[in-house]
Amino acid sequence: MLKVFSNPTQIVTVNTSGKNYKRGKEHNDIGLLSGYSLVVEDDIIKDFIPNTSVKNYETDEIIDVKDKIILPGLIDCHTHTAFAGTRSDEFRDRLKGKTYEEIAKTGGGINKTVAAVRRASTEELINTISPRIDYFISQGVTSLEIKSGYGLDFENEVKMLKVISFLNSNYEIDIIPTFLGAHTFPPEARDNHRAYIDLIENDMLLYIAHNDLAKFCDGFCEATAFSLTELEEIFRKAKSHGLAIKIHTDQFRNLGGIDLALNLKAASADHLEVVDDEDIKKLGNSEIACVLLPGTSFFLNVPYAPARKLIDNNAILALSTDYNPGSSNISNINLIMSIAALKMKMTIEETISAFTINAAKALMISEDKGSIEIGKKADLAIFNTNDYADIVYNVGRNMNYMTVKNGNVIYIAD
């Protein structure tokens, strides 16, 4: 079936000429087209035609997007959307001066959410998570990564991943599952790390890989979570089962996580708030996507990752919400883009590249997603404005008018 999305003011293609990611100065090249309409055949981007040619073009459907702009479907590549309960009490405590780490050391933090997820039934989790996914879709998201990591035992990690799998089967967008059993040690393993690591390696990973429940294995390299040695062991086991690697690293301390990511050829290194100059240079010479999470810095009131240094050193930079109940209770992508521009000195164009093609790179899906290029999937976000700059300029405002997945309109704003 042929469709024409006709008469947009702009098409922001984020064209990569087949490279499928952007690094360094390339982030600013977003492939802007004016005066063209977009032709989609079934689920594939087929062509760009002059607006003046639309009336004579043989097509099955014309979708008028006059006075609007077309972007690639947005991609949120690092989220903890599958959670239950609330941590609003901890938010109050932080406003009174407690740090995120202090709260975690006294039994709060991640383990509070673990308790809530363990209590929740599968049905309760599905009903809780679904409206969050609906909101992402309403913003123009067509691919969404969701991590486990709030079960922290065999039964509940598997429960989380099966819920994520169910949601992926029942939503039009792609929901990419990540196993985050190495998020932190559960209370019952606080004094017996070896037993929990063995559980991850011998039981969880084996079952998850056999049942195809996750694409990635992630882990949190931090003093309050897993050591470098512990994560390396887990990651090597995960790779032996066919899972790709992601790592939470350099959020509060630099413990050597970047070298581990490089050695294991990780898909992405995420957080990087305290990454040092030496590691920035290494990342700039690598194929690893650097996933920055400015919502976390905003929410915790801590320093931001050095986006400018990373870009100036030729790194591949992606952005994500890090949506979670404790350190970034923010699922508003427009807000994250604005924070990245205002606080990390990124250009508007850089934030767009970071939430499209490079976010796709972080999820290893950039060969057919993340940019509007002939032959790629027709995943689109169509915004109700004449200028792409408005998306970042209008802080926190959802300007998405239409979300298109695989050529099909799945959301239209009221």
Language-model regions: role of each:
Residues 244, 254-371, 383-389, 395, ...:
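Active-site-adjacent C-terminal substructures of enzyme catalytic domains
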Residues 68-128:
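Metal-associated gating/positioning segment near the N- to mid-region
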Residues 1-56, 388-390:
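N-terminal metal-binding scaffold of metallo-dependent hydrolase/deaminase domains
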Residues 52-71, 76:
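Active-site metal-binding motif and surrounding structural segment of the metallo-beta-lactamase
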Residues 8, 38, 43, 67, ...:
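Divalent metal-coordination and catalytic microenvironments
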